[in-house]
């Protein structure tokens, strides 16, 4: 009976030891879980902040692209109008030179036909 009692005591000691080891492993696992939950929370906060920042950057970018497009449109319209002004100026200059030439010829013809009698 003493052998059975000793064996039972031995089993009991091993059971207690195994339970203590399991409790220690559980505590370590709980510590790791808490660390990872903290890390998860930190990462979620970073993602939220980055998402908000990305939204602000996208809004700013959209406004700036719209402004650039407006600049492009204004520049294109202004350049087209300026080219029309240049063409009109060239046409006006050609007409003016032609008319001045015609007037010069007409004046020269008038002076020849009058023969300088007015003097």
From Swiss-Prot:
It comes from Mus musculus (Mouse). Belongs to the SSNA1 family. Residues 13-70 form a coiled coil. One of its GO terms (molecular function) is identical protein binding. Microtubule-binding protein which stabilizes dynamic microtubules by slowing growth and shrinkage at both plus and minus ends and serves as a sensor of microtubule damage, protecting microtubules from the microtubule-severing enzyme SPAST. Induces microtubule branching which is mediated by the formation of long SSNA1 fibrils which guide microtubule protofilaments to split apart from the mother microtubule and form daughter microtubules. Plays a role in axon outgrowth and branching. Required for cell division. The gene is Ssna1. Its main location: nucleus. The modification N-acetylthreonine is found at residue 2. This is Microtubule nucleation factor SSNA1. It is found in: Nucleus; Cytoplasm, Cytoskeleton, Microtubule organizing center, Centrosome; Cytoplasm, Cytoskeleton, Microtubule organizing center, Centrosome, Centriole; Midbody. One of its GO terms (cellular component) is axoneme. Disulfide bonds: none annotated.
């Amino acid at each position: 009976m003493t052998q059975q009692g000793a064996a039972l005591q031995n089993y009991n000691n091993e059971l207690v030891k195994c339970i203590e080891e399991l409790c220690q492993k559980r505590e370590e696992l709980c510590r790791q879980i808490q660390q990872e939950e903290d890390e998860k929370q930190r990462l979620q906060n970073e993602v939220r902040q980055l998402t908000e920042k990305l939204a602000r950057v996208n809004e700013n970018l959209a406004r700036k692209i719209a402004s650039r497009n407006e600049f492009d449109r204004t520049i294109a319209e202004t350049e087209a109008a300026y080219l029309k002004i240049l063409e009109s100026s060239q046409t006006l200059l050609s007409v003016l030179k032609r008319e001045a030439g015609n007037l010069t010829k007409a004046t020269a013809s008038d002076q020849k036909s009058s023969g300088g009698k007015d003097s």
